[in-house]
A protein has these predicted regions:
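Secretory/extracellular carbohydrate-interaction modules
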Residues: 63-126
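Short, aromatic/His-centered strand-loop micro-motif at the edge of beta-sheets
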Residues: 127-149
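Flexible glycan-contacting loops in extracellular carbohydrate-active proteins
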Residues: 171-201
Length: 210
């Protein structure tokens, strides 16, 4: 039997450990809350990067331009079982534009959109093979000056990507080596967007737990 004083302490301890706020499930990364968490990635000869009215504008670099979100860890965003949604537009150029680098557990990978001449889609890198060489390689046509909606799902055993509502990547990552292609893309970790000799815009970046 628990005495009155002990019962009170037990109830207080239970309240402190079980009655906190529920875990956060959604982050709007281009909202005012995270305005100070974005910066240019600092790539060699990159174009101008601006953040205004909930949108990222990336001017063409020589060859690459990047935007980096540095608050992934401090904001306690997930590294698995989460989804990323955003819209990307290629304004000028004919290479990748809405390319996003993101965490997967203890690693990072990059979703290439419109690379290798304008149409290639895929994940870099799986088992040291980049998006043009592994099983995620695909092709899609992207018209300039149009918004293209993108959804990425990071699950325990697989990665899935939809562009314009169409499933374009569905790959198992169980037992696979996940990594980034060597070079300036590493400056976009833990999360960021990159273009290659291309002017682009990105908006509506939302991360949600699955």
């Amino acid at each position: 039997m628990i005495g009155g004083g002990s019962a009170l302490w037990f109830c207080l301890l239970f309240a402190l450990t079980h009655c906190g706020p529920p875990p956060r499930t959604e982050w709007k990364l281009l909202s005012d809350e995270f305005e100070s968490s974005w910066q240019a990635a600092g790539m060699a000869e990159e174009g101008r990067v601006t953040f205004k009215d909930g949108e990222i504008s990336l001017d063409a670099g020589e060859p690459m331009t990047g935007a980096r979100f540095e608050a992934w860890q401090s904001a306690r965003l997930p590294r698995s079982r989460y989804a990323i949604e955003y819209e990307a537009m290629r304004v000028e150029g004919n290479d990748f534009f809405g390319t996003v680098t993101f965490p997967v557990n203890d690693s990072h990978v990059t979703l290439v959109i419109g690379g290798w001449g304008g149409t290639l889609v895929g994940i870099s890198s799986l088992d040291d093979l980049d998006a043009s060489e592994n099983t995620t390689t695909g092709n899609a046509f992207f018209k300039n000056n149009e918004w293209h909606p993108v959804r990425v799902e990071v699950r325990d055993d697989d990665l899935r990507v939809w562009i314009g509502g169409k499933l374009v990547v569905n790959v198992s990552i169980k037992g696979r080596k996940l990594s980034l292609r060597a070079g300036d893309i590493e400056k976009c970790t833990p999360f960021g967007f990159t273009t290659y000799a291309t002017q682009a815009r990105v908006r509506g970046v939302v991360v949600r737990r699955l």
